[in-house]
Every structure is written in C-alpha cells, then in structure tokens.
UniProtKB/Swiss-Prot annotation:
Superkingdom per UniProt: Bacteria
Disulphide bridges, residue numbers: none
Reaction catalysis annotation: tRNA(Phe) + L-phenylalanine + ATP = L-phenylalanyl-tRNA(Phe) + AMP + diphosphate + H(+)
Species in which this protein is naturally found: Fusobacterium nucleatum subsp. nucleatum (strain ATCC 25586 / DSM 15643 / BCRC 10681 / CIP 101130 / JCM 8532 / KCTC 2640 / LMG 13131 / VPI 4355)
Gene expressing this chain: pheS
Amino acids binding Mg(2+): E252
NCBIfam families: pheS (TIGR00468)
Signal peptide span: none
Protein name (database record): Phenylalanine--tRNA ligase alpha subunit
Amino acid sequence: MKEEILKVKEEIQTYIKESKTLQRLEEIRVNYMGKKGIFTELSKKMKDLSVEERPKIGQIINEVKEKINSLLDERNKALKEKELNERLESEIIDISLPGTKYNYGTIHPINETMELMKNIFSKMGFDIVDGPEIETVEYNFDALNIPKTHPSRDLTDTFYLNDSIVLRTQTSPVQIRYMLEHGTPFRMICPGKVYRPDYDISHTPMFHQMEGLVVGKDISFADLKGILTHFVKEVFGDRKVRFRPHFFPFTEPSAEMDVECMICHGDGCRLCKESGWIEIMGCGMVDPEVLKYVGLNPDEVNGFAFGVGIERVTMLRHGIGDLRAFFENDMRFLKQFK
C-alpha cells in the first residue's frame, strides 16, 4: 500500500505543477483531498491492514497529505499572483492619452453683476439688507404712498397670493422694514428677486432689482447725483450721465437717470433709439409721506432713494439684447461669461 500512496503523491504533484488556472487547481484538490477524494479512499483501505502496519501507513498518508496541502497552497498563491499581473497588464492606463474633459461651472452673469454693484455701494458705506419675497400689500404698496387706484396694484402687474399678500414687485418693502427697525442716519441697499406678470424680450416674471435708500439730516439732490454718478462710472466707465424729471409715488422730486449709449457714444443708434442715451434707473428724494409712515419727522430728516434693474445693467455691460436668455439655461450662452 505504501507504493500506491507514493504513486498517488507523484501523480498529484505532477498535476499541481501543470495546473494553469485556479479552477483546475481546485478540481485537483477536490479529486485527491476532498471528502470523497482518493486519500479518503486510501484511508478506508487501512482497515484491511495488520495492527502493526496501520500506524506506519497512517503516518505516511498524513505526511503525504501535509506535503500535498503545502504544494496546493503554494500553487494557489502563484496562480493568484499570475492572474493579478495579467489583469493589471490588460487594464494598464496609457498616461499619454488625453484626459476626460470636465465642464466647470462659473458665476452666472446676473450674480456677477449683482456682486459688482454690491461691492461698489459697500465701499461707499451702504449696508446690504435682505427681506422676504412674499410680502404684505401694506409694505409693498401702502407704505410707499402708492394710491389704491394705481395700475401697479392690478392683477396684470402683481402676483397676488390673497387679498393682502403678494410676491413683492420691488425691493422697496425692505426699505420700509429697515426704517421701522433702525434709527437715522443710514445708507442701505436691498438687492434681490422681484416678481411681475410680464414676459417678453425685456421682461420676465422673475427678475432682480437693487434699490437703495439714504436718510439723514440735510440730504440733497446733489448727494443723490454724486453717489449715482460714481456708481455708473464704476460700472460703465467714464460716461456722461443725465437726470430727467419723472414721477414716482414714493419720491418727490423724482427723476430718471440716463447714461451715454455705450454703442454709439451719444451719436444715436438702434440700441438707444437714436437718442444717444439709455435709461438706467429711477431715483428721487424720499416723499415726506413715506417718512411719516415709518415714524420719522420729514422736518428733521430727509433722504433719497433709487432703484435699478440688475438684468438691465448686465445686458448693457455685455451687449445682450434679450433678457430671457439669462433664464433659459442654454450652455452655449452661459459659456460666454467664463
């Protein structure tokens, strides 16, 4: 029986050495070392041996099995390493190939313009204030001296949530809230989203406004002109400006501020409708009724206010003709501002 065991040993050693895959190696292990394998059958034959032979043959079988298990482990390790190397070689990355191109985002042109405007006014000592976009009719209209019959209160110009709540049509309500909570003197701007039911080449239902307010003693129209002229020059460069008389319910006197056309430089073109000027914002001295509403005495303090559309400034800065392009998420359009 000893010869039979040694023959099996040589046979399995050859098979292990010639095995090329882990699957084949596992088949060899099961055939020889498994519960129904050849060594199990050899162990069963020991019952036919004499009492003297059994310990010797049992020792030989155990030594051979130990040797075979060691060979199986070594071959298993070698085959695993071989498979890993083959896989790594097949998956090797050619670092000379061009990399994947990623599309990186950038600041939206409206946000970029808003930050520019905020920085300009911040350097002039203005506080930057935020407020709710869902507003009361009282703060959106009544407190601003807007008559009950004013067309801006109509459903065609305002989004009503109910009879007393609206989506704010301007950021002016933030000024009312600020004056009710802060003493004078102060300078503040309130940039943010506003809403009106319009949609065409120069209007969208949601857009951005920045309104400003300065209140203190002996504030003059000259102060207004100086601050707004500086703002325009910071945004558009050294251009001429002019102020035209206008009407707003919350300022008296009121004016529209124009800037020299950046296309024709005042000679007249399609953009400025041959006038040489482009309207940039509304402004004026705060109406005494507005000051009274927030508990201020117009005989002791006064001030000026202004409001400018951020989309309009952005369009003029970049020569964009359709306001709706800002909100259509067209990457071909937005990539221009990287």
